[in-house]
Amino acid sequence: MIDLSTMKQQIETLLNQAIERLKTKGVLKPEVTPVIKITHTTDPQHGDFATNLALTLSKAAGMSPHALAEKIVEALPPSGQITEVEIAGPGFINFFVTEGSYQTVVSSILKAGKDYGRSEMGKGQRVHMEYVSANPTGPLHVGHGRGAAYGACVANLLNAAGFEVHREYYVNDAGRQMGILALSVWVRYLQGYEASIELPKNAYQGEYIIDIAEALKAKYGKQFYHSVESIQAKIPEEIDSNADPEAYLDVWVTAQKDLLGPKDFECVFQAALDSILNDIKNDLEEFGVTYDDWFPESRLVREGLIQEGLDLLTKHGYVYEKNGAQWFRATALGDEKDRVLIRKNGLPTYFAADVAYHLHKFNQGYDQIIDIFGADHHGYIPRIRGFLKGLGKAPEKLHILLVQFAILYRGNEKVSMSTRGGTFVTLRELRHEVGNDAARFFYIMRKPDQHLDFDLELAKSQSNENPVYYIQYAHARICSVFRQLKTTQKNWDRPRGMENLSLLSTNYEKELLATLGRYPEVIKRAAMNYAPHLLAHYLQTLANQFHTYYNAERFLIEDDNLRNARLNLINAVQQIIRNGLTLLGVSAPEEM
C-alpha cells in the first residue's frame, strides 16, 4: 500500500542518504544541515516529484547548482520505486516513480473506503476551536456564513488528520448589545398597546424583533406594559436622541430595567435571547455546522472566571487602578494602550470577559486553541497575545485565524448587512436560494483572508463554470456508469480489476492515478495550514480530469480485463470525491 506522502518520505530518505555520502567524500562539510523540500510536479514530462535541494546547498558546496545536482544524483541509493532521476534547468532534480506505485493507490482507496485519506498525524492532540460566535441579537447573515463554513471544514480536516477537536460557540449573552436587544423587543411589545411610542433609531429594527414581541404579548398579555408617560418620566430632557443616539439608547435601557424590575426584565431579556439563539442553532444545524458546546458569557461571572483572571493578572503585576476603574497594563506587553478591565461602576468590560474566557480555554489543557474571527478583529490579536502573557500562558498555543466577510451581490448591486438596521440578507435566505452545497463550497473555495464576492447567479447555475456543480456532476456520472452496468450482461469483477491495473496506460488514466495518490497529502496540508480551499481546488482538478477521461474513453467495453480495471479506477475516483466533499460539508449526489 502506498500514498503520495509515503513516496515523498522515501525520496527524502534517499536524498538524506546521498547527502551523508557526499559529506563522507568531502563534497559537503559535516555541519551542513539540508532542508529538503519535495514537490509534486505539474507536468508529467518532468517526472512525478522534484526537489530544489541542489540550489539551496550550492553555496555551501562551493559549486554550481547543476554540478551539485549531478553529484547528488550519483550518490543516490537505488530504489525499486524510482525508475528514473533527471536534472532539469539550473539544478532541479526530478524523480519518476514506477507505474505500479500509483496503481496500488486504487486498491488502497477501495480497501479503506470512507477512511482513505485519514491519518494519525495529529496523534490525538486535543484542539479547541471557537468560530462564528455571533452576538445573539439577530439572525445570522451571509457574512457569518463564511466563518461557519470555514470553521466547520477546518474542524473536519483536523479530525481527519488525527486531532481530537472540540467545537465551541461563545454566546455573548451579557453586555450592552443584549440590553439593547431586550429594549428593542420591549418597545415593539409596547407598540401593540401604544401606537405613539417610537423605537429609538439605533435600536434593532428587523422584522424578527416584532415577531418576538408579538409572541411575548400572546404569552404574557399586558404584564410588561407601562404607559408612554411613565417611560418619558424616566428619560432626562437634556438627552438628545439625535445628537447622541447611543447615550439615548443607554438611558432607555436603564428606564426599562427600572420600570420592569429585575424579574420582568429578565423575562423579556430571556425571551429575546432564547428566540434568537434557537434560531441561530437551527440555522447552523441545517447548514451542517454543529458544536460540542455553547458557552455563555454569563457563565464567566457565575463561576467566578472573570475574578480568577483579574486575580492572576494582579498577581503578575499587570493590574492598576485609575479613576475608579481597574486597568490592564497592556502597554508593558506590546499593546498600543492600556485596557480597562473593570469599569468604575464595577461592571466588567468585554475585554475582561475575553481574558476570562481564554483563561478557561487554557485551563482545560488543550494542545492547541484556535479562534476564528472576522477580519475586522485584526487589531484585537496583540491584545489577546498580551493578556495571555500576563496570565502566564503560552501564546504560541493560540492560533487566531481571520476570515474576510463575504459580500453578496445581486447583479451589480451590493447588499447591505446592518443588523440593527434590519436590512440584511440572512444566511437562511442565502441557503434557501442557492442551496447548502453551493453555499458551503463557495464560502471556502478561496483563502479565508481573501475578500469573497459571492456570485449568486454562478452559485445557482448548472454549468461547468459552477465548481461545486462540476465536482458533484463527476460523482453522479460515475454513479450512472454503475447503474448502466446493471442493465447489461457485463459484470464487474473487482479482484480481476486489481490484477489488471497495469492495463491503465492512457495519459488520462495516468493523470487520474497520480492525482488520486496525492489525496492523503492534500488532507494533511489542508489540515496543518487550516486551508480547506486546498481540498476544494484538488477536487476541482480531479473532477476536471475525470470529465476529460469520461468524454474520451468508454468503460462498459467487451474486454473483461480492461473493463474491470477501468471500473475499479472510476470507483476509486468516486470514493475520493465523496470523501473530499464530505469533509467540506457538501453532498455527493448519485443523480443530477
Curated annotation (Swiss-Prot):
CDD domains noted in UniProt: Anticodon_Ia_Arg, ArgRS_core
GO molecular function annotations of the record: arginine-tRNA ligase activity; ATP binding
Catalytic activity: tRNA(Arg) + L-arginine + ATP = L-arginyl-tRNA(Arg) + AMP + diphosphate
Localization annotation: Cytoplasm
Top-level taxon in the UniProt lineage: Bacteria
InterPro entries with a match to the protein in the record: aa-tRNA-synth_I_CS, Arg-tRNA-ligase, Arg-tRNA-synth_N, Arg-tRNA-synth_N_sf, ArgRS_core, DALR_anticod-bd, Rossmann-like_a/b/a_fold, tRNAsynth_Ia_anticodon-bd
Any GO BP annotation: arginyl-tRNA aminoacylation
Pfam families to which the protein is assigned, alphabetical: Arg_tRNA_synt_N, DALR_1, tRNA-synt_1d
Gene3D superfamilies: Arginyl tRNA synthetase N-terminal domain, HUPs, Isoleucyl-tRNA Synthetase, Domain 1
GO cellular component: cytoplasm
Enzyme Commission number(s) of this protein: 6.1.1.19
Residue numbers covered by motif 'HIGH' region: 134-144
UniProt cross-references to PROSITE patterns, sorted A to Z: AA_TRNA_LIGASE_I
Keywords (A to Z) from UniProt: Aminoacyl-tRNA synthetase, ATP-binding, Cytoplasm, Ligase, Nucleotide-binding, Protein biosynthesis
Oligomer status and interactors: Monomer.
Family to which the UniProt record says this protein belongs: Belongs to the class-I aminoacyl-tRNA synthetase family.
PANTHER family (UniProt xref): ARGININE--TRNA LIGASE, CYTOPLASMIC (PTHR11956:SF5), ARGINYL-TRNA SYNTHETASE (PTHR11956)
Name of this protein: Arginine--tRNA ligase
